[in-house]
Swiss-Prot record:
Residues 5-109 form the SSB domain. Keywords: DNA-binding, Plasmid. PROSITE patterns: SSB. Homotetramer. It comes from the Bacteria. Residues 110-150 are annotated as: Disordered. It comes from Pseudomonas putida. InterPro entries: NA-bd_OB-fold, Primosome_PriB/ssb, ssDNA-bd. Residues 116-131 have a biased composition (Low complexity). The gene is ssb. Gene3D superfamilies: Nucleic acid-binding proteins. This is Single-stranded DNA-binding protein.
Length: 161
């Protein structure tokens, strides 16, 4: 018997530029706010109604670096992660937050193109990350250990058969 499934899939719009920081071990963490909207027609008034939800998303590792480099306010993105609730104490009061966590088991895919400035240049090229750790020597490249955080097109092929 399965223990359970904790999977969240969102397609939404970044509400702000992602915030990238680095942990003491050098791993990247990116936080962003993702807005999703749904529309329906109110049966009593006949008017269209729209409701927007804002989701807190935390990305870890290589996918966090990619999100920080390519996502900007207004970017549309596909996120696949898990729901987690964190607890901490501030001023003697317990606080909680629930967020979508995207780690090595999760997925992030940019939808559409890279955001452009008015002069046509890529924003990611102009904005540099201020808190990058000192460069570490890279291990030899292993083509079988390719950590691309985008969806595998063959991943859902079993559903189509």
């Amino acid at each position: 018997m399965a223990r359970g499934v904790n999977k969240v899939i969102l397609i939404g719009t970044c509400g702000q530029d992602p915030e990238v920081r680095y942990l003491p071990n050098g791993n990247a963490v990116t936080n962003l706010s993702l807005a999703t909207s749904e529309q329906w027609t109110d049966k009593q008034t006949g008017q269209k109604v729209e409701k927007t939800e804002r989701h807190r998303v935390s990305l870890f590792g290589k996918v966090a670096e990619i999100a920080g480099e390519y996502l900007r306010k207004g970017s549309q993105v596909y996120i696949e992660g898990k729901l987690q609730t964190r607890e901490w104490e501030k001023d003697g009061i317990k606080r909680y937050t629930t967020e979508i966590v995207v780690d090595m088991q999760g997925t992030m895919q940019l939808l559409g193109g890279r955001p452009q400035n008015q002069d046509g240049t890529n924003q990611a090229q102009q904005q540099r990350r201020p808190q990058q750790p000192a460069p570490q020597p890279q291990p030899a490249y292993d083509p079988m250990d390719d950590d691309i955080p985008f969806m595998d097109p063959y991943r859902f092929s079993c559903l189509l058969q």
